[in-house]
Amino acid sequence: MTKFHVKLYAKAVESRKLDQIQKDFEKKFNRKIDVSVEYCYHVITQEPELISSNWEKLVTLLSHSPFETSVWKESQLHPEHGKNIEIGPRTAVKTAACTNILSIFESSGIKNVERIERGIRYLVEDDVDVNEFFEIAADKMTEAIYGNDVKFDDESHQIEKVFLIDVLESKQNLIKANEELGLALDQLDLDFYYDFFVNKVKKNPTDVELFDLAQSDSEHSRHWFFRGEIWIDDRKRDGSLMKTIRETLDSSNDNSLIAFCDNSSAIRGFESVCRLRPNDPTTVSPMIAIFPPSHLIYSAETHNFPTAVCPFQGATTGTGGRIRDIHATGRGAYEIAGTVGYSFGNLNLPGLPLPWEDETFEYPTSISEPAKIAIEASNGASDYGNKFGEPVISGFARSFGQRLENGERCEYLKPIMFSGGIGAIDKDEVRKEPCAPHQKVVKIGGPVYRIGVGGGAASSVSVQGNRENQLDFAAVQRGDAEMGGKLHRVVRACAERIGGNPLMAIHDQGAGGNGNVIKELVEGCGVTVKSDTFQLGDESISLRELWTAEYQENDAALVDASLLDALQTISKREKCHVSVVGEVEKEQRVKLLGKSGEIAVDLDTRQLGEREKKVFKLKSAPRVLKKLELPENLTVRKALKRVLMLPSVASKRYLTCKVDRSVTGLVAQQQCVGPLHTPLADVAVVALSHFDTVGGAVSLGEQPIKMLIDAEKGARMCIAETIMNLIWAPITDLKDVKMSGNWMWAAKCDGEGARLVDAVGALCRGLREIGCAIDGGKDSLSMAVTAHGEVVKSPGTLVLSAYAPCTNVTKVVNPSLKAVPGSKILWIKIGSSEEKMRLGGSALAQVYSQIGDDCPDIENFSEISKVFSIVQQLLNREELAGPLRKPIILAGHDISDGGLLTAILEMAFAGNVSIDIDIKPPNQNIKPIDILFAEECGILLEVSNPENVLHIFSEAGIKCQEIGKASAVFGPDAHVKIHVNGHLEINEKLVDLREEWELVGDRLGEFQTNPKSLKEAREVRRTCQKINYKCDFDWYYNPAFIHNEQYFSTAPRVAIIREEGSNGDREMASAFTLAGFQTFDVTMTDILAGHTLEAYRGVAFVGGFSYADVLGSAKGWAAGVQFNESVSKQFEAFRSRPDTFSYGVCNGCQLMAQLGWIGDEEQKGPTVFLDENECGRFDSSFGPVKIEKNVSIMLSGMENSVLGLWSSHGEGRFTYRNLQNFQNLKTNGQVCIRFCDDRGMTGADHGSVKLPYPWNPNGSIDDVAAICSRDGRHLAMMPHADRSFLTWQWAESSEVPWNARFDQKTVALSPWIKMFRNAYNWCL
């Protein structure tokens, strides 16, 4: 059939990208260039009249704003004195954007479009070299230059046929295939497979079988090293590393439910947790409260190789794969929140040379430069989480690159992209059902693409950089968070289904693709898989690619045949494809049949399971170490200036501000604390429900630079850091703590394997001493790269993730100093004698280009247990302060990178207060630099009753020193004074020190944020004092009706409406339920299928990224309403009914603006549009807003209040068709909420058009945050009241003065609940 390639041109919104291109081009080629830009949409269709018959729809969808027509059939860039260069995604694979636009087209009634991709066309001067421009403007791994004849439907691609590798004739043929196919088989593998095919099964393998086995049996997939037989210096180790790790479970509490046997680990949680879920997820149904036993799960993995090759996509797929690990636990589980970590080489930032970075180091072209990894990997992980709807609530970042004393270069050229996540699982879903004949084998999720081919093998080579770049590129996957979200909703719906979970067992697809995941699924049985049952995204896929590609957002599951219809109904509702690809058979044999019946795979799984352990013979190699030599006359102040710029110490604001930290409404503690939202929290905490205060706590620990000195000491310090980060959340018991251990190590390089073995032994011995245990983890043992002929090893790294049940999420302590009168700051040194102040492996050593020869260690683990126990007791104790309660521990922080001085300063930075400190060394011979910069284990406490606390520690035999206090002098007036033994070492303004700490993060921020916004943020940090919240109304009531099913049968109904890509429906449902409504789960699929809104008094349009916001925020969602006549009429009828109300937040706000539900009703059509944030990116923040006098029914009685509120969006800037429209809104009282500053003042109060960033996070004129309809019934707001209606959801909850009025053991309602209660009362 004839296909037509049509080009449409549109206005491009790429000002930030253009600015960066011009700066980068000038820097690299020493010349300024002028650049103009437009979009070009390449539409592949079989319908010649497609454009003309759908022109109005296409203009609406492809124009940037509803206020202008900016789509053309001809290019608007006319190269009279220049030339056009078009850059777009590589044409071999459909992009995630294409998939989402096609979904929008289908919803809008635009048919017969096979593909649509967007290129960016640039107009540059004639003498600009195309290749040079491409190098600056594009990502070579994912983009290409488009010529006029660019093809997206290359029918000349030949499908590669299955072929045999003739191993029966010669082993050399196997060796040749290993090289040509990039299988990364080592000699042991070659010997095994040669014997397997020649002597056991007596046949030649197909290329598909061999490729399958290479991925499934790779180090990445099977962890041979950790399971293998280890010899060190010709002495056999007693047991495998895995055995040693598993044995830690014997010393901890017996609360593990899943350990080392599923996609995530699980521990016992709480017996009865009230949660909302749909009564029937196959259709529209009420949300009902259930009380199941709810357990905690955690999973962590790294995606290092893909991130090295292609940072953005490598990180997106690492995040997506780990999320699927969470939901594919047991028979289906629920993700709640993520953790992240990035380790990269020297940044070499332009204009900011860091004195410890070696200018002579060269970087290979086959992997990305460290600065690009730091920026784009974090962009990728953040983007995926934002679109999926998973908050990122904890993490780390580290940079290292040095030449060690033995002459070796050690640097994170092979980076670490760490992704972890905590979730929940119901008791009945913990165990997978065993496979049994006649069960259906199904694939759920996205279609098959030629991406991620050979990733398991690629990640398992000893040293990266020796393969062809094309093989490495083929192994990198592509992420599609929209599809990931749809897949997750299917799994969650199955697990929540009251009539029985259709999923008997489920595994996520990862390394090895279908070949690996299906073999896992049918272990103990067999299956015949038919290739023509798969949904293909590319018809030219070969059988080898279909069977082994890691194409993302896909799960395999066993389904009871009687429940298959239920699964397919759920999948249709969630718009997620299900393919039945086979049926379980009794014979233990896995077969793959081609379309013509040819056999591509035929493997006896029993024979494959007989493989023996691999044997690893290692040699130890002592470190060459040198004592730390610091410059003579080095002052504390000079040392501090450098230390504050080290990325592991410096501000991580460039990471936290761009990632959602509030979605789900279950986050009780994320990274940012204090009035300036400073990223310093030690522990991350989530609740299991909006109706309870129990949850889970997570902390991370990693100490790789200390491991360079002594692997055993570094491992023990990892334990210490992890536990001292976790200490600030009340948990059930220290022995309930379980950990994931992730090992990133060049273990196959000389000496490194033995060091890894030492570290494992030290870790496990230490954990047994305190009663904690490892219950899962991963390893990445190919952490070396060839750079210009030199092997560069990344520092051996262990990342520990601890998780435990949290008994009360309202009792968490963070590092922000409160400066309460009478409070004091205490220092507790833990685990070693108080005289030891070792600087080896410290930030101070690194910034002077050394590591030293002796690092901190834990010599007494019992002190860790004692201190942990005491702090836990104190977390749950409070004192009366007049009519209110006051906690004993006001603030707390662990001592880690940067040492004691950095920890003290960070607490002051977060609290924005003055501090006066005097530290008394236990020994007069200890130098100030030693005591201030040593990274010995310890904690700092700000306490309200210092005498009592000192006594408690003394009674337990723990030395605790009072070192000073914080004073209620804030911001620009705050001062920092640090004395050591009475001698003044630091005497500076707080804001000056803090800006030194923010400097490197700000420079990294310039690559992703509007420099104007960064400048404004610096000024805000310098002038902010303390946020003054104000609330004069009463909002509290007892929502006991939650437990009364009969109550909801007569309650007013609210439809919680979501579209594909929405992610804020559960928190929205909880808010309205707590207000007294009966809430219903309603999808746009339901409405398009005929479900009406007649029975509802209210509708709520939820937040998220409908269709990934691919054509602009909520544009696809709006099109599904506007271009479907029956839906459009129904929506308009609901809007016009005088007894109805609506509430839209974030994406829902954008939808209401697109539909014209808010704005100036005197003019037809949309008069309000939410444009891109002025900062140029997604922004997540918690800040004050002011509720104005307004006509909204939901905000009645709340006027003049100043309350804290979460904002999380990329396109939230209110713009208007004209200024008169905006003036009418103000005159009519339709502008309901404005952003304000720490004093409760708006830009107008200061005589300005708007407040600076981040007080105004999106740049809206007049600081507008919410607008309602003329009659007040329809309210749309960008910030999230649906994530701020409980006190513990507030980032500043510990500092809100009215919180102590209420018993936190009941539902801790915040003032925002009045919004929802107002709506309820209006309906009565």
UniProtKB/Swiss-Prot annotation:
E.C. no: 6.3.5.3
Organism domain of life: Eukaryota
Residues at the catalytic site: 1146 (nucleophile), 1280, 1282
Keywords carried by this UniProt record: ATP-binding, Cytoplasm, Glutamine amidotransferase, Ligase, Magnesium, Metal-binding, Nucleotide-binding, Purine biosynthesis
Alphabetical GO biological process terms: 'de novo' IMP biosynthetic process; purine nucleotide biosynthetic process
Binding site for ATP: 314-325, 394-396, 681, 896
Gene3D superfamilies: 3.40.50.880, Phosphoribosylformylglycinamidine synthase, linker domain (1.10.8.750), PurM-like C-terminal domain (3.90.650.10), PurM-like, N-terminal domain (3.30.1330.10)
Reaction(s) catalysed by this chain's protein: N(2)-formyl-N(1)-(5-phospho-beta-D-ribosyl)glycinamide + L-glutamine + ATP + H2O = 2-formamido-N(1)-(5-O-phospho-beta-D-ribosyl)acetamidine + L-glutamate + ADP + phosphate + H(+)
All residue ranges annotated as the Glutamine amidotransferase type-1 domain in the record: 1053-1295
Biological or metabolic pathway of the protein: Purine metabolism; IMP biosynthesis via de novo pathway; 5-amino-1-(5-phospho-D-ribosyl)imidazole from N(2)-formyl-N(1)-(5-phospho-D-ribosyl)glycinamide: step 1/2
SMART domains: GATase_5 (SM01211)
Principal localisation: cytoplasm
One of the record's GO molecular function terms: phosphoribosylformylglycinamidine synthase activity
Subcellular location: Cytoplasm
GO cellular component: a single term: cytoplasm
Purpose of the protein: Phosphoribosylformylglycinamidine synthase involved in the purines biosynthetic pathway. Catalyzes the ATP-dependent conversion of formylglycinamide ribonucleotide (FGAR) and glutamine to yield formylglycinamidine ribonucleotide (FGAM) and glutamate.
Family assignment from sequence similarity: In the N-terminal section; belongs to the FGAMS family.
NCBIfam families: FGAM_synt, PRK05297.1
Family annotation (HAMAP family): PurL_1
Protein name (record): Probable phosphoribosylformylglycinamidine synthase
